[in-house]
Amino acid sequence: MNQATEPRLTIAVITLNEAKRIEQCLRSAAFADELIVVDSGSTDNTQVLAKRMGAHVFEYTDWQGFGEQRNRLLAHSTGEYIFFLDADEEITPALQSEIETAIATATTDKWEVLWNQVAYGKPLSRMRSTSGVTR
């Protein structure tokens, strides 16, 4: 994790029993100035593993919905830019480069990231998103 005095980029993750995935997820996000995890009451080692990866971990077991957990992430984030990442997702080196370039050039306040669907290491070419909410 970048140890800048004032974080520019926070990567924020919501978790619940993600011990099998959280290290890989956070390892891909290690370039960020700040890693924040809001845990929803994991009963496995998710919190311990996230802390070992350098994340600031906050536990909220009173599940009030996905939106509330996101708001809690925002409340703990100090970065100028916040990137929401799901625990089963990874930031590729190419995406990392795009994120760093976008922040360095800072021509907008919001970016939408398009991603590839991958299963068992292979792209899912017959699957596409038809609609949804920007998040």
Put a short name on every predicted segment.
Residues 1-28:
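N-proximal low-complexity "stem/linker" segments adjacent to membrane-targeting elements
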